[in-house]
Amino acid sequence: MTQSTTPAPSASVAVSKENTVNQKTKINLLDLNRKQMRELFVSMGEKPFRADQIMKWIYHYCYDDFDQMTDINKVLRAKLKEIAEIKAPEVSEEQRSADGTIKWAIKVGSQQVETVYIPEDDRATLCVSSQVGCALECKFCSTAQQGFNRNLKVSEIIGQVWRAAKIIGALKETGRRPITNVVMMGMGEPLLNLNNVIPALEIMMDDFGFGLSKRRVTVSTSGVVPALDKLADAVDVALAISLHAPTDDIRDEIVPINKKYNIEMFLDGVRRYIAKSNANQGRVTVEYVMLDHINDSTEQAHQLAECLKDTPCKINLIPWNPFPGAPYGRSSNSRIDRFSKVLMEYGFTTIVRKTRGDDIDAACGQLAGDVIDRTKRTLKKRLQGEPISVKAV
């Protein structure tokens, strides 16, 4: 085949300003979805199918070295090495739980986010972060106490999946399953980073990416309603909603974004999402953390059932996972059981989530990472004399 003499493009081709440092920076191919990858190859004078070949090497085989891609000719490999790279964030620390859960501290610049691998008998779920810290200040969540620094880039989101897949693929231990499910339930609010989360989701579900079913990719949100509508128009994935309270007065206190988008507005947005989605099979998952004598009474169970009567859903009750400095307690098993029974009497599918990885601070609500807080939230807490949680890493 005759090779094109088209000059190699500058490193800014097909990459958004957010994911480009300067004109001399190589393009990180992990920042590109398939459409962008094809645009890059066309700009190089290559056929679009070359992008598909490269994506298979990157995501099916977890290769990051162009020279290992044996069905790519040497001239194209040389071109790619000049202008591009495949660079996933590195693991700075690994912790293993007695229950098989693995938590990785992932280095992103001078900071760290956390990614969790949760193996089960019939699946293996990867919990992925979307931001360095979180801006939403949910009172029961360790991540929220660290403040917020920045959004993760596409390569830093999909790179968590790539890095985990490479590590798990290399493990020869019995029972280590490949990743079957991804949940955007790590550090950060995914809907506040849609510009990077959406391309990452597209790569997760692309046949030339990780090829996951849309029913096995879940985005969790605390209720950024306008962004929920944008997500519905952009990509179809399973949805989980962090509700955590049956009434606005309680939710205003523990999930402060409720003061802007209250429960009625949130659930209206959820029903609009369900109407557009096939991935959810007609219902969403409601996440409800169980806080002792805060939101776990029998009366509140009845209130929750009334609140959700027009929203097709299943309900996950999550025993709260403690972290240092938190002002809450975990609901007792008896209170959780009573709460669950009330919901089931109303006909709701209700599951009490099994706690995984709490011995390594990898359970729901415990992820902390290492965040340089741009919101000055921790400073404000010190000045006000409020308790401050200790980082898990």
From Swiss-Prot:
Primary enzyme class: transferase
Gene Ontology MF term list: 4 iron, 4 sulfur cluster binding; metal ion binding; rRNA (adenine(2503)-C2-)-methyltransferase activity; rRNA binding; tRNA (adenine(37)-C2)-methyltransferase activity; tRNA binding
Record text on cofactor binding: Binds 1 [4Fe-4S] cluster. The cluster is coordinated with 3 cysteines and an exchangeable S-adenosyl-L-methionine.
Biological process annotations from GO: rRNA base methylation; tRNA methylation
Chief location bin: cytoplasm
Range of residues in the leader sequence: none
Pfam families registered for this protein in UniProt: Radical_SAM, RlmN_N
PROSITE patterns xrefs: RADICAL_SAM (PS51918)
Localization, UniProt: Cytoplasm
Reaction(s) catalysed (UniProt annotation): adenosine(2503) in 23S rRNA + 2 reduced [2Fe-2S]-[ferredoxin] + 2 S-adenosyl-L-methionine = 2-methyladenosine(2503) in 23S rRNA + 5'-deoxyadenosine + L-methionine + 2 oxidized [2Fe-2S]-[ferredoxin] + S-adenosyl-L-homocysteine; adenosine(37) in tRNA + 2 reduced [2Fe-2S]-[ferredoxin] + 2 S-adenosyl-L-methionine = 2-methyladenosine(37) in tRNA + 5'-deoxyadenosine + L-methionine + 2 oxidized [2Fe-2S]-[ferredoxin] + S-adenosyl-L-homocysteine
Enzyme Commission code(s) on record: 2.1.1.192
Keyword tags: 4Fe-4S, Cytoplasm, Disulfide bond, Iron, Iron-sulfur, Metal-binding, Methyltransferase, rRNA processing, S-adenosyl-L-methionine, Transferase, tRNA processing
Record keyword Signal present: no
Residue ranges occupied by any Radical SAM core domain in the UniProt entry: 120-359
Family annotation (Gene3D superfamilies): 1.10.150.530, Aldolase class I
Entry GO CC: cytoplasm
Annotated binding of [4Fe-4S] cluster, by residue: 134, 138, 141
Active-site feature positions: 114, 364
HAMAP family cross-referenced by the UniProt entry: RNA_methyltr_RlmN
Similarity comment: Belongs to the radical SAM superfamily. RlmN family.
Function: Specifically methylates position 2 of adenine 2503 in 23S rRNA and position 2 of adenine 37 in tRNAs. m2A2503 modification seems to play a crucial role in the proofreading step occurring at the peptidyl transferase center and thus would serve to optimize ribosomal fidelity.
Remaining remarks: Reaction proceeds by a ping-pong mechanism involving intermediate methylation of a conserved cysteine residue.
Protein name: Dual-specificity RNA methyltransferase RlmN
